[in-house]
Amino acid sequence: TDTTRSFLSGGTASTRQKEIYTLVLKSILATQNAVFPENTWGSVVDGVARQPIFRSGLNYNHGTGHGVGINVHEGGYRLSTTSSTPLKENTVGSIEPGIYIPGFGGVRLENVAVVERHHEHKNMLRFRTMVYVGFDHDLIDFDMLSEEEQTWLDEYEKECARRGRSFKYKS
C-alpha cells in the first residue's frame, strides 16, 4: 500500500498549522466524495481535489494521485493537472494532496482508494477507501469542515478504530 500521514512533532499546533492540515484533509474528502462518469479524465478529478486548496490561494506542484500495485507507482490511474488517463472501474490509486510553504513547513496526506460503480447511480463512478489509518485530530480545525465532511471523517475514524488504527478512538 501507499499511505502518508503528517504529524506535529512536539508542542501544540498553531492556528496556521491547523488550517494547512485541514485544507489538505478537505482535499482528500473532496476527492473521496466525488461522483463522476466513467472515462472521466484524471485531470478533472485532480481539479476537484485541488478546490479546497485553491480557495485559500494555495496549490501544490505534484499530481494528486497515481496507480498503486506491485510496484507502488503504476499506470492506468493518474490524477494530475495534465492527465488524460480516463478513470475506470476497479482501478486502484492514491489520493495524496499536499501543501508546502517555504520557511513554514508542509503537510501531505495520502489514502489509497479503488474506483467503483456508484451504489445508487449505476452510470457513475466514485472512490471507495481501501486504507484505514486515522488522521491527527489535534491538527484538524473542525470549524473548517462541513457537516458532510465531519460525518465522513467520523465514520472513517470509527472504521480505523475497529481495525486498531485510530488516533481518536480506542478500539
List PLM regions with ranges:
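Active-site neighborhoods and metal-handling regions in enzymes and metal-associated proteins
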Residues: 1-171
